[in-house]
Amino acid sequence: MAEHKVGTREEWQSARDELAKLEGEQAERNEEIKKKRLELPWVEVEKEYEFDTEDGKKTLAELFDGRSQLLAYNVMFGPDYENGACPGCTMLADELSGGLVHLNHRDVTLICFSRAPIERLIAYKKRMGWEFPYVSTYDNDFAFDFGLAMTKEQAKQIPEVQEMLADPPEWLDEWSDQVGAKLEDALGENPSWIAFARENGTVYHTYTVSAPDPFVAPYSSFLLDRTPKEQPAEPRAWRKDEYPD
């Protein structure tokens, strides 16, 4: 006998109809939020940035690769991470390559940023089998200027970060071991999506969203939300070549 509540088909349909109303309300709310997102003012990027890429140095405008929109995920992979990128960020990045062709044909270039040196990014990308362009922000202030990373001084001003450092939960200590960095160094990276537009040769910052927003979670998390069994509140993430089984 299943531990979960078992009912008749009629009971299931009644409960499903009730849930559908809530899901419909959420969908309407999501459309309202989407409209507000598109209405955000654009901010011109006046500072010049130079990035290390697999093809040499590039400016922010050159990262668009001829398209008018740039969407980037900031993978937590700081200069102090000795064991590679954050496993959770790695899970999300694993799911991006298949969407490249579809985004490119819709005038969007998709890339990932990290603060580790480009040589380490290239090696990690090869290990994971990723296909998207991987760009290093190691030699510039881009990550700090756009909130993709924070200095230790900035971290001291954030109560949530200080609470985690003062009394880290077990999963956070395990995560720190996985990335191979002291917790105070590891938490300096901010998993985020960031978007830019390019019009008439000018680049504009248009949007940023960071954890714990659900959009920063791997898509597999949304799939797991539709499965019968509830997932742990803080499930441990694994790189795909490190699962213990």
Model-derived features with residue positions:
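Residues at the C-termini of beta-strands that transition into short coil/loop
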Residues: 114, 136-138
